[in-house]
Design a protein with these regions (language model features):
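Substrate/ligand-engaging "lid" and interaction regions
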Residues: 1-191
Length: 191
């Protein structure tokens, strides 16, 4: 919905989702499709919104989380955690042509790109230690001219959704447009 200064409105449907793929090595069809996507030279960016905890590989005492320990032991073909799945896909990309890519954390935490990079490099190094990947792959992932980890800042300050716009959209035949009140008493809407 575009609100013009003269009070008129313009409506456009913006479709940003083309496909959904499970990032599970236990599902061969989805896993192979994910590999196909990651090995495509046209893929330029992968974004993440997995919360700061999604990048964590170790508990507070410095030991690996059990799923991370399993990922290190089992390697790229049986990756389960988010960072292991990402590194497994980067390994496929490396083998396919060492194509550049930007890995963009959109999580609202300080130095989000650095946190993502640290986790990716840690998993990469651990897999190198046990022989799943080679030094060339470590160099590929470490070179920020090829695999970039930019820092981002997310601004979620948005105006309260208009109930009138929701009604107008529903009158146009678009369903479920009413704003929702969250547990934190903020308002969100699908428009």
């Amino acid at each position: 919905v575009i609100l013009h200064g003269d009070g008129t409105r313009e409506y456009k449907v913006i479709g940003a989702l083309a496909e959904a793929v499970k990032a599970q090595s236990s599902d061969p069809a989805h896993w192979n499709r994910l590999k196909e996507i990651f090995t495509s030279k046209s893929l330029q960016m992968v974004s993440f919104t997995i919360t700061e905890k999604g990048y964590a590989l170790q508990k507070a005492d410095g030991t690996w989380f059990p799923f991370v320990e399993a990922d290190i032991k089992n390697g790229p073909d049986k990756a389960t955690g988010a960072m292991a799945v990402l590194v497994a896909m980067l390994y496929e990309r490396y083998k396919a042509g060492r194509y550049p890519i930007a890995l963009v954390s959109m999580d609202n935490c300080s130095q989000n790109g650095a946190k993502l990079r640290e986790s990716v490099l840690t998993m990469t190094e651990e897999w190198k230690k046990v022989g799943f990947v080679d030094e060339g792959f470590v160099n590929y992932v470490s070179d920020e001219k090829i695999v970039a980890f930019p820092w981002t800042m997310i601004d979620k300050i948005t105006p309260r959704p208009s109930e009138q716009i929701a009604a107008d959209l529903e009158n146009l035949g678009i369903e479920n447009m009413q704003p929702v009140i969250t547990s934190k008493k903020t308002y969100i809407a699908p428009f």
